[in-house]
Curated annotation (Swiss-Prot):
Superkingdom of origin organism: Bacteria
Gene name in the database record: argF
Similarity comment text for this entry: Belongs to the aspartate/ornithine carbamoyltransferase superfamily. OTCase family.
Species this chain originates from: Thermotoga petrophila (strain ATCC BAA-488 / DSM 13995 / JCM 10881 / RKU-1)
Protein name: Ornithine carbamoyltransferase
Entry keywords, A to Z: Amino-acid biosynthesis, Arginine biosynthesis, Cytoplasm, Transferase
Length: 313
């Protein structure tokens, strides 16, 4: 099928079909090869990207800014201290002004409602660089990394360990369901996936001959896993809950024993970063031969560039 995504925003992968995600991954492969050969095509020459950050960032800022600059574009960093973002001026009005002056907007912050309003009122493509609910650009990089390792996505088993209701787990669950993969959320009952998103992903999985499930049982979750994935136990804004989370999530630490429980020496370990080594994952695993976290981090740039190419050109 012919895919045309020009003018689209990326707010959540729930808005994208399997074919559209496949299209983005194919572009990602192409731009990664270009990057390796130092090819610069200046696709975004004369364009401006506004990057709004309510939350700190390493990978997201670097990925968007370098991806846009490599193609000849100009990226502007904006913090809440730099612009009116719902204070003294409505969010709707800020979005309208931005839309008259830039070609695209990236937002990384707290409320999903904020990125949705930016998309509704700006009239230009808006990219979700992370909200409390979703992290779609991370999920695209995850898919790219998995496919690079296994040569396919269909049928790959992915186990997310720990806080399975956080934004990274949620977006990865959506991505796996869309692409025909088998996703297992493994963690305590108190931190199980959001019921509405979980049920929607199960519906999608039935359509793609995949599966989406939750369990607190490590043996059940890990048997035959191709990918073991985890994230920090206390996300940004939840630092006050860290002690409680450590107690709750300690049984779900990814360590050598957990990796061996898959029964597959080719199982890979993934983490969106930043990581608290010795907490959600041991130093031995994240620095070991099964770890793909640095490939995963690099792939943020290539998949983000692909999203911008698909929606701006």
């Amino acid at each position: 099928m012919s895919v045309n995504m020009k003018g689209r925003s990326l707010l959540t992968l729930l808005d994208f079909s399997s074919e559209e995600i496949r299209y983005l991954l194919d572009i990602s492969k192409q731009v990664k090869m270009e990057s390796r050969s130092r090819l610069r095509t200046e696709r975004f020459k004369g364009m401006t990207l506004a990057m709004i950050f309510e939350k700190r960032s390493t990978r997201t800022r670097l990925a968007f800014e370098t991806a846009f600059a490599e193609e000849g574009g100009h990226a502007i960093f904006l913090s809440p201290n730099d612009i009116h973002l719902g204070t003294k001026e409505s969010l709707e009005d800020t979005a309208r002004v931005l839309g008259r002056m830039v070609d695209a907007i990236m937002f990384r912050g707290y409320k999903q409602e904020t990125v949705e309003k930016l998309a509704e009122y700006s009239g230009v493509p808006v990219y979700n660089g992370l909200t409390d609910d979703f992290h779609p650009t991370q999920a695209l990089a995850d898919l790219m990394t998995i496919e690079e390792n296994f040569g396919r996505l269909k049928g790959v088993k992915v186990v997310f360990m720990g806080d399975t209701r956080n934004n990274v787990a949620t977006s990865l669950m959506i991505a796996c369901a869309k692409m025909g993969m088998n996703f297992v959320a493994c963690g305590p009952e108190e931190l199980k996936p959001r019921p509405d998103i979980f049920e929607r992903c199960q519906e999608i999985a039935r359509e793609t001959s995949a599966s989406v499930s939750f369990t607190s049982n490590l043996e059940e979750a890990l048997a035959g896993a191709d990918v073991v994935y985890t994230d920090v136990w206390a996300s940004m804004g939840e630092e006050d809950k860290e002690k409680e989370r450590i107690s709750l999530l300690k049984p779900y630490q990814v360590n050598k024993r957990v990796m061996e429980m898959t029964g597959k020496p080719e199982t890979i370990f993934m983490h969106c970063l930043p990581a608290v080594k010795g907490q959600e994952v041991t130093y031995e695993v994240i620095e070991g031969k099964q770890s793909r976290v640095w490939d995963e981090a690099e792939n943020r740039k290539h998949t983000i560039k692909a999203v911008m190419i698909a929606t701006l050109l």
